[in-house]
């Protein structure tokens, strides 16, 4: 009986040891994606069809009144929840702790310490928008002025 218990324990330990040799595979959305034709985006509209891959694509006027297209991260800068776009109020509202963000991504209410991050965005020769989520831009560091963080329309 003792041998059965000993062999069972050693077999279990061997299985757990072998299990650690194989890493956990994490399925994540692609770091870059095609966001369609530039001309399909309407002014002052948030396109949430890419929310599942972690981005909103937006066409709006910036602080210098330029018509631009940019991609915002769907991650709240407070605790990482996903804000919702409230079309009637023209703002992003985080359901976790009430942070509010303007269409530009700038925080104006709640505990979020900084604006939403922008992703790198570019246009192909055919006018197709490519969003690259591996490159992020933060407003508080002055990175929103980088020409890779927006497209002029």
Protein language model features and the residues they cover:
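N-terminal pre-ligand scaffold of iron-sulfur
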Residues: 2-86, 119-153
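Membrane-embedded segments
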Residues: 73-75, 82-104, 115
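Exported/periplasmic cell-wall-interacting domains
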Residues: 107-115, 124-125
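Short, basic/low-complexity N-terminal boundary segments at the transition from targeting/disordered tails
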Residues: 103-106, 152
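Proline-rich low-complexity regions
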Residues: 23, 95, 111-113
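A sequence-level detector of short linear motifs
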Residues: 102, 109, 130-131
């Amino acid at each position: 009986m003792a041998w059965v218990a000993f062999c069972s324990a050693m077999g279990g330990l061997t299985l757990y040891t072998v299990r650690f040799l194989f890493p956990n595979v994490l399925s994540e959305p692609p770091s870059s994606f095609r966001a369609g034709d530039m001309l399909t985006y309407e002014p002052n509209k948030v396109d949430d069809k890419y929310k599942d891959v972690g981005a909103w694509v937006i066409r709006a006027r910036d602080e210098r009144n330029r018509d631009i297209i940019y991609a915002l991260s769907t991650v709240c800068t407070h605790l990482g929840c996903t804000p919702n776009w409230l079309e009637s109020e023209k703002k992003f509202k985080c359901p976790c702790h009430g942070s509010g963000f303007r269409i530009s991504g700038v925080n104006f209410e709640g505990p979020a310490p900084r604006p939403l991050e922008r992703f790198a965005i570019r246009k192909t020769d055919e006018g197709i928008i490519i969003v690259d989520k591996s490159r992020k831009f933060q407003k508080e560091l002055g990175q929103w002025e980088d020409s890779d963080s927006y497209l002029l329309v």
